[in-house]
């Protein structure tokens, strides 16, 4: 493959893979259940998730946003959730999604409270260690989840409004200003919740090489005529802002658009 990056999804090293598909009944009592869905697919999937979860099943949600774990926990119980996030900068070309493996952070996971090196954390580390998956366990998983949430709100949404590539934040002071205002609102809410994202600044800033024309997931959804995850991004932030008495005018404007 002469491409500087490798394909993710239906194209990987120019090969097509067909994943093995199980029904929830067939997957019942699996040791590990990874939830990787678009936000609008989560609620319809909850009955299937519940059916697949057994007494000792660990559930990891790699979804965007900051509330998927809470939604899943209401269905299966808090004890099954191991908080996690995936950080990978990819862009679509033809039928494939491409990324740079050497700069991809991958999956980050951990317990919300001590012991942070729990038996299940060690088990996931051992499992992923036998694969090519990039991963890291952390004791600051809540901050990591919110750090990605911030990236999505600040980088995904403004470019989606105008239909511009990610280079718009570098080329336009106005786009950068919108991104900064969305960021300020999110950080104010995070601070009110006791979430200090500075704890993960040094470990979550590795960036994949993305061309200025790259269109992130929200804009890709609009391009394809799909429902976006704006409700998970700005919608959730607005709700949290109202609960905490923190104004979120830029997110309200973005949601309305």
State where each predicted segment sits.
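Helix-loop-beta segment of a Rossmann-like dinucleotide-binding subdomain
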Residues: 53-56, 98-111, 162-169, 214-224
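Rossmann-fold dinucleotide-binding core
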Residues: 28, 64-144, 148
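Short, structured loop/turn "capping" segments at alpha-beta junctions
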Residues: 134-138, 160-168, 196-198
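NAD(P)-dependent Rossmann-like dehydrogenase/reductase catalytic/cofactor-binding core
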Residues: 129, 180-257
């Amino acid at each position: 493959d002469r491409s500087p990056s490798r394909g993710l999804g239906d194209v990987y090293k120019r090969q097509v893979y067909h994943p093995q598909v199980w029904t929830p009944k067939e997957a019942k009592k699996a040791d590990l259940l990874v939830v990787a869905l678009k936000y609008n697919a989560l609620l319809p999937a909850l009955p299937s998730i519940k059916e697949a979860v057994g007494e000792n099943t660990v559930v990891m949600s790699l979804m965007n946003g900051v509330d998927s774990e809470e939604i899943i926990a209401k269905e299966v119980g808090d004890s099954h959730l191991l908080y996690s996030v995936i950080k990978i900068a990819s862009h679509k070309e033809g039928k494939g999604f491409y990324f740079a493996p050497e700069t991809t952070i991958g999956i980050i996971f951990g317990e919300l409270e001590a012991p942070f090196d729990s038996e299940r954390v060690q088990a996931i580390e051992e499992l992923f260690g036998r694969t090519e998956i990039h991963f890291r366990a952390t004791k600051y998983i809540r901050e990591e989840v919110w750090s990605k949430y911030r990236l999505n709100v600040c980088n995904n949404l403004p470019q989606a409004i105008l239909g511009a590539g990610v280079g718009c934040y570098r080329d336009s002071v106005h786009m950068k200003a919108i991104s900064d205002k969305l960021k300020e609102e999110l950080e104010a809410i995070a601070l009110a919740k006791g979430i200090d994202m500075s704890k993960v600044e040094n470990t979550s800033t590795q960036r994949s090489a993305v061309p200025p024309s790259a269109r992130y997931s929200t804009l890709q959804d609009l391009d394809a005529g799909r429902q976006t995850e704006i409700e998970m991004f700005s919608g959730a932030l607005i709700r949290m802002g109202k609960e905490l008495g923190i104004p979120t005018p830029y997110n309200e404007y973005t949601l309305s658009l």
